[in-house]
């Protein structure tokens, strides 16, 4: 605390930082909780012969937020893996990721760093169909890349290490960056894979479509089943809730600490003011009872023992209130009896 009981700059920064972080974490928690609640309330629709009749009876021939599960089937053509034979899919993602070590000037350590230097995603139209044979129904999946959880499977991974000469190594140490290599990855959504779709289910011209939902709800095309997907979302909600509570507790603790310090400072000021008033009252009583010739000596008396003359000037407060013996008897750390400020230096006072 600074003088006067005001919070210090560090305390203001700490309180402001924890408050902002708490507000941000709480906002993320509320958003995650809302997403989880909407996902929990999504209507489960069976991919069967009665799907079109269910949608035709729904308001607007639409289920705003539905869960449907089926197998992936391409509409016409398929995508072939560039690295794996006889691997066909409807979504293909090729990624080149650079891995390197970067020198941290603060910690004086080499830190791992990775960066995507190239990524390409190819898609072809595909449907979700029942796992059972003989059921003539399909759901066309629209805008799959808008999904927040695209169930791609890594079918190929290879790391290409960097080949470095001695001069390259010296140059990397000087520049503070040491390349490790390039990781090449291919991910695919295979034909026949089981996919759980969560989105808007619409019947349009006798065809069923699954598309991104409206009203800010999230679109899912996950390789997990619905229960696992919901459990993962709820785990995420619990994590953000715990983080918000921890930082909220830190904010409350910081605020309590600041207010408590202010309260104690105020109580100390009131106590010192009361002591000063008592000293002045006691001194006034002594002066009123003393003989006229003794009043000057009483004005110069030590406020502690009232028997010796004041002989010390306390710095930095500048009070002249104590004799040398009483100053030496003050407990460590020595503080002025009047204002309770720390005594940094004592100047002897000589009475003529």
UniProtKB/Swiss-Prot annotation:
Entry's Pfam families? Answer: GIDE, zf-C3HC4_3
- An annotated GO cellular component: peroxisome
Q: Where in the cell is it found?
A: Mitochondrion outer membrane; Peroxisome
**Catalytic activity, EC:** 2.3.2.27
Q: Which residues lie on this side of the membrane: Cytoplasmic?
A: 1-8, 260-352
Q: Which InterPro entries match?
A: MDM2_MDM4_MUL1, MUL1-like, Znf_RING, Znf_RING/FYVE/PHD
Is Ion transport there in the keyword field? no
Where exactly is the Glycyl lysine isopeptide (Lys-Gly) (interchain with G-Cter in ubiquitin) cross-link placed along the chain? 52, 273, 299
Q: Which GO terms describe its molecular function?
A: identical protein binding; p53 binding; ubiquitin protein ligase activity; zinc ion binding
What spans does the record annotate as topological domain Mitochondrial intermembrane, numbered to this chain? 30-238
Query: Which residues span the membrane?
Result: 9-29, 239-259
RING-type zinc finger positions in the chain?
A: 302-340
Quickly give the catalysed reaction. S-ubiquitinyl-[E2 ubiquitin-conjugating enzyme]-L-cysteine + [acceptor protein]-L-lysine = [E2 ubiquitin-conjugating enzyme]-L-cysteine + N(6)-ubiquitinyl-[acceptor protein]-L-lysine
Q: What class of enzyme is it?
A: transferase
Keyword tags: Isopeptide bond, Membrane, Metal-binding, Mitochondrion, Mitochondrion outer membrane, Peroxisome, Transferase, Transmembrane, Transmembrane helix, Ubl conjugation, Ubl conjugation pathway, Zinc, Zinc-finger
**What is recorded about the protein's domains?**
The zinc finger domain is required for E3 ligase activity.
Q: What is this protein called?
A: Mitochondrial ubiquitin ligase activator of NFKB 1
The taxonomy runs: Eukaryota, Metazoa, Chordata, Craniata, Vertebrata
């Amino acid at each position: 605390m600074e003088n006067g009981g005001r919070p210090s700059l560090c305390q203001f920064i700490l309180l402001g930082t924890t408050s902002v972080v708490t507000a941000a974490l709480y906002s993320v928690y509320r958003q995650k909780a809302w997403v989880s609640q909407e996902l929990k309330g999504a209507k489960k629709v069976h991919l069967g012969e009665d799907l079109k009749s269910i949608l035709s009876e729904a308001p607007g021939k639409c289920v705003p937020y539905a869960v449907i599960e089926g197998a992936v089937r391409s509409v016409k053509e398929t995508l072939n893996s560039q690295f794996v034979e006889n691997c066909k899919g409807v979504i293909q993602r090729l990624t080149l990721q650079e891995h390197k070590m970067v020198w941290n000037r603060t910690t004086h350590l080499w830190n791992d760093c990775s960066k995507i230097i190239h990524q390409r995603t190819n898609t072809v139209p595909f449907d979700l169909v029942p796992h059972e044979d003989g059921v003539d129904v399909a759901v066309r999946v629209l805008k799959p890349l808008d999904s927040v959880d695209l169930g791609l499977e890594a079918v190929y991974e290879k790391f290409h290490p960097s080949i470095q000469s001695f001069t390259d190594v010296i140059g990397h140490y000087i520049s503070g960056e040491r390349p490790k290599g390039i990781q090449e990855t291919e991910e695919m959504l295979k034909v026949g894979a089981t996919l759980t779709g969560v989105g808007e289910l619409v019947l349009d011209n006798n065809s069923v479509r699954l598309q991104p939902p409206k009203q800010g709800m999230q679109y899912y095309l996950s390789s997990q089943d619905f229960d696992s997907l919901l459990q993962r979302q709820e785990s995420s909600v619990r994590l953000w809730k715990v983080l918000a509570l921890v930082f909220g507790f830190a904010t409350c603790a910081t605020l309590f600490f600041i207010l408590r310090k202010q309260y104690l400072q105020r109580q100390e000021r009131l106590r010192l003011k009361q002591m000063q008033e008592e000293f002045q009252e006691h001194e006034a009583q002594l002066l009123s009872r003393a003989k006229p010739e003794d009043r000057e000596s009483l004005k110069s008396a030590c406020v502690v023992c009232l028997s010796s003359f004041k002989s010390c000037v306390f710095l930095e407060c500048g009070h002249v209130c104590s004799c040398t013996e009483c100053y030496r008897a003050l407990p460590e750390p020595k503080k002025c009896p009047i204002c309770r400020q720390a005594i940094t230096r004592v100047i002897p006072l000589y009475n003529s």
